[in-house]
């Protein structure tokens, strides 16, 4: 799923990409990946790195592109292992912000709703990256409290 998000009073979805907007891609199809490479020249190596479920958090530069990989929490339906982490990549240059996650998570939709509720004005890519890191930490703590509640006494 591909979303074009523009920050007004929080992030709102638009029908097409606008300069300084955020392209969020969740569970990308081959067409989504090709779109990112063709339309925005996103490095293919970045997209394949994010696809690796064992990818570790890091930053990497390639030309004028910056790749930031985070590990974000994911709730599983498997009762033996109720929680896991998956990589999300935030790919930026001077004109675009792209996030790619190969898994459906609660983090990004919740983050978008939060920016709308608080009418946040996120001014640049660095602020967005830091706010996504913070949101990830909030979800880790939320899931940690669920683990604590469900522990047998």
Where are these regions (language model features)?
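Peripheral, non-transmembrane regulatory/ligand-interaction domains of membrane transport proteins
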Residues: 1-150
